[in-house]
From Swiss-Prot:
Residues 142-403 form the GS catalytic domain. Glutamine synthetase that catalyzes the ATP-dependent conversion of glutamate and ammonia to glutamine. Belongs to the glutamine synthetase family. GO terms for cellular component: mitochondrion. Disulfide bonds: none annotated. Keywords: ATP-binding, Cytoplasm, Ligase, Magnesium, Manganese, Metal-binding, Mitochondrion, Nucleotide-binding, Transit peptide. This is Glutamine synthetase, mitochondrial.
Length: 403
């Protein structure tokens, strides 16, 4: 390990004394994409040209990884006022891990529409479901089943809020602002930190925040997280299927903002091994009954149901069936142990946290702290509804309708 021109600190790491080097911002030149060096002023000249009534609609979908998003744009003759006015489209699924080359056409079915913060009005962002050649949902299309489940319990008025954590990286995978071949100072000053030595990449955070508000995303806040170059934003409250729609588009916008700045936003639940916090997507959940007076009883009933179905939720809470979360849910760094279920008031080391204010008011919501940063919000919200409201039990979800 190369020693930076600064101070050597000894910090305690998992019971062992491990040397950690204080960051030196001049040690390492961050690797950025070549596209970030292109002139944005030149581009602006073209983006200000009139569109003569035409509209650019960017169709966005989740690819076969269940984590990455893809997009392409088509021209519309008029500004669409609703999803019903948007045409279906298609794409080559063999290039997105979603089909074989011999039968590669797949359908894009518009499902949610937002304002486009990059091209601006009247242009649109269009979130799409993916259907296979036989018009059955693609394996990565978890929205389809989520919408069915949400429609079954609409009279419960389920609200969700998801806390999306992410880590900023250079194009070489090195954490943004970290010195080369060593570490920044130990965790402590970065959470909600202010200052050049504590907040790494705030320009990206602010740009993303404003872009989401412009698009119509229910983005309710943001903050720097515990690890240097790690951030969080919160989406919600959203009712039913809207939670997944808004979180996926917020992720797309974050990737596009980072693309402009030439760096990467990673949703890996444990991007840096060792004595560093991982990244999650803590999910807040409530129903009308929970929010009304005396709602704590319904919260406690739901937690009891969740405790009996822990492994089912662990599999639903990351795209690799729990393997990603196994790196993050260690029982350390404000996480629960992946193999154990726990709950408590104001306990950030539990599977389920009841906020202190909820315990005092005897109503409100609870926070499921198990979903990973790269979770599919459709899978997470569907699993919560199945267990808490449809009273499902066992290791597999019930199939209510095959159509």
């Amino acid at each position: 390990m190369r020693i930076c021109r600064s101070f050597l600190f000894l910090v305690k790491k998992c019971g062992n004394i491990t040397p950690t080097i204080w960051r030196n911002q001049h040690t390492y030149k961050m690797a950025t994409s070549a596209s970030a060096n292109l002139s944005k002023i030149v581009k602006k000249n073209y983006m200000e040209l009139p569109q003569d009534g035409k509209v650019q609609a960017m169709y966005i979908w989740i690819d076969g990884t269940g984590e990455a998003v893809r997009c392409k744009t088509r021209t519309l003759d008029n500004e669409p006022k609703s999803i019903a006015e948007l045409p279906e489209w298609n794409f080559d699924g063999s290039s997105t891990y979603q089909s074989e080359g011999s039968n590669s056409d797949m359908y894009l079915v518009p499902s949610a529409m937002f304002r486009d913060p990059f091209r601006r009005d009247p242009n649109k962002l269009v979130l799409c479901e993916v259907l296979k050649y036989n018009r059955k949902p693609a394996e990565s299309n978890l929205r389809h089943s989520c919408q069915k489940i949400m429609s079954m319990i609409a009279n419960e008025y389920p609200w969700f809020g998801m806390e999306q954590e992410y880590t900023l990286l250079g194009t070489d995978g090195h954490p943004f602002g970290w010195p080369s071949n060593c570490f920044p100072g130990p965790q402590g000053p970065y959470y909600c930190g202010v200052g050049a030595d504590k907040a790494y990449g705030r320009d990206i955070v602010e740009a993303h925040y404003r872009a989401c508000l412009y698009a119509g995303i229910e983005l309710s806040g943001t903050n720097a997280e515990v690890m240097a170059a790690q951030w969080e934003y919160q989406v919600g409250p959203c009712e039913g299927i809207q939670m997944g729609d808004h979180l996926w588009i917020s992720r797309f916008i974050l990737h596009r903002v980072c693309e402009d700045f030439g760096i990467i936003a990673s949703f890996d639940p444990k991007p840096i091994p060792g004595n560093w916090n991982g990244a999650g997507c803590h999910t807040n959940f409530s129903t009308k009954a929970m929010r009304d007076d005396g709602g704590l009883k319904y919260i406690e009933d739901s937690i009891e149901k969740l405790g009996k179905r822990h492994q089912y939720h662990i599999r639903a809470y990351d795209p690799k069936g729990g393997l990603d979360n196994a790196r993050a849910l260690t029982g350390h760094h404000e996480t629960s142990n992946i193999n154990e279920f726990s709950a408590g008031v104001a306990n950030r080391g539990a599977s389920i946290r009841i906020p202190r204010s909820v315990g005092q008011d005897k109503k409100g919501y609870f926070e499921d702290r198990r979903p990973s940063a790269n979770c599919d919000p459709y899978a997470v919200t569907e699993a919560l509804v199945r267990t808490c409201l449809l009273d499902e039990s066992g290791d597999k979800p019930i199939e209510y309708n095959k159509n």
